[in-house]
Amino acid sequence: MNVEEVQRRLWDDSKAQRQHRESSTPLFPTSPHDGRARNVMDLMHNPTWLTTAALRVMKRSRNKAPGVDGVKVRDFQKGFEDKIEQLRLELKRGTYQPQSLRRVMIPKANGKMRPLGIPCLCDKIVQEAIRMALEPMFEAEFHNNSYGFRPNRSTHHAIFRCQQLMRSKFTWVIEGDVKACFDEISHKAILKVVREKVLDNKFMDLINRFLKAGVQVDGVVQPTEKGVPQGGVISPLLANAVLNKLDWFLHDQGMHGKVRARGYLAGRPDARFARYADDWCVFITRGSKRYAEGLREKIRDFLRTTCGLELSVEKTHVTHVRDGFDFLGFRLIMDTGRSGTNVPKILLGKKAIPNLKERLEDALRRRPHQESVALRVQRASAVVRGWSEYYRIAHDFPRRAGTLDHHAFWIAVKAICRKLDITTAQAVKRYGTRGRIRVGDSCELTRFSGIPMKLDYCGPEDYEPGQSATATDSELEVSFSRYNEKKRPGNMDLKHRVLERDQYCCQQCGCEVDDQDSQMDHIQPVNCFASYARASYFENLQTLCFSCHWSKHYAR
């Protein structure tokens, strides 16, 4: 069996169902009335399908905590084929029973605790097999403005979607959050959306068993009558499938096609949205605050009746874009540019820097006392790189880099003082070099000022069946470059011509650059021309590095 080919057919059939037509070559015998897939349970006990799921889970879970049975990846690798065969037979006979989840509490940013449910390794494998079958079906149905826990999509895509809507003269925004989405989501709603895609009672019974498996707290198993475990393999997909109903409800609140053109002429309100998991924003144009508040009540009623969920009162607000709003850790606000035009800005959220300080202190302090300073600095550097990779799309990231370096330097100095029992002056003299923390010749604390802001961006690529997980940042970078080369060949060719003319050197500082770390700068400002296209002619472009480009435009 070719797993990717099967997923491709599942995706094609589901897409055909959405378009209200029958697939020409369906994988499973389907009813001519609804096009739902049958005999999906046969995939669950197929040796190739189950082995593929096991290998994916073992690769991701190598260093993860075990479930209630205590079995780790290295334990499962011993007699791997026999264990897979036993698991396959249990699924085929219908005797497989998921074990309860191990409950772990982790702190949230607001000081509360978030419950995580850790399944055992065998349950993860079966859940992965379920996900491999369901994901292609649901991806054909998911709305394009949903970005959470989906292949080739990330929080950055959602943020840039919001920026795009702000640029399109959407003035009011409803910033919303679903209250305890994973904990309160209705099992009935989950089974209903799965049943819309699958006509297989055995498969539905398997999903129901996972939903009712329960959680183990202090050795006592507590039943689960609602919600999906945060930590389960299929939990994000099932939650997305239910919230997809909300996406299409919000889609229907806006105007599209010819209706949108007529609505624009008539001055009627229009709405657009972006959603990442249970966080979402609805943007409204040509509408008043009262209209936005009325739409918020419609959303509240829809969630309550269709999904069995409630809006979080303390996190759902109606805000004007000029006042700014928080979304996914960023602060988005409409600012006024130097030429008097409206410019949507992406800024660091108010919790971003305190969160960074806490993580740095934890990386430098919460370890065995005998651990060396070099190892602690390496771990802190990983925190700096990870935090910067997420927040470097913010417009104020370059401006705050020096302040962040200052914070990181003194947090590291204080941690070194505690470990070595020396004074601050001694720590700075031994490890501080021109505002840098350096241990030996090869270990240095990564500096924020050396990380460029992320400028190049384009939308997420279409879903391709066979993708196994949400894309990593490196994979997203590759997809961005493919998108540029494929859909913007003229721009890429012009960039290469400018780079060759400038001999791949920054025209301000003289450093060497390449395709990835170079920027095209307009010698004469764009506002001196009638359009952006007229400003972007060959003679008006020059090569600059990231630092020089942003110093030119934002260091004033």
Where are these regions (language model features)?
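Right-hand nucleic-acid polymerase module
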Residues: 354-423
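Non-catalytic, polymerase-adjacent accessory regions of viral genome-replication enzymes
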Residues: 1-82
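Histidine-centered nuclease catalytic patch
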Residues: 510-543, 556
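Short Cys/His-rich Zn2+-coordinating modules
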Residues: 483-494, 523-531
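Short cysteine-rich loop/turn motifs with clustered Cys
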Residues: 490-519, 543-547
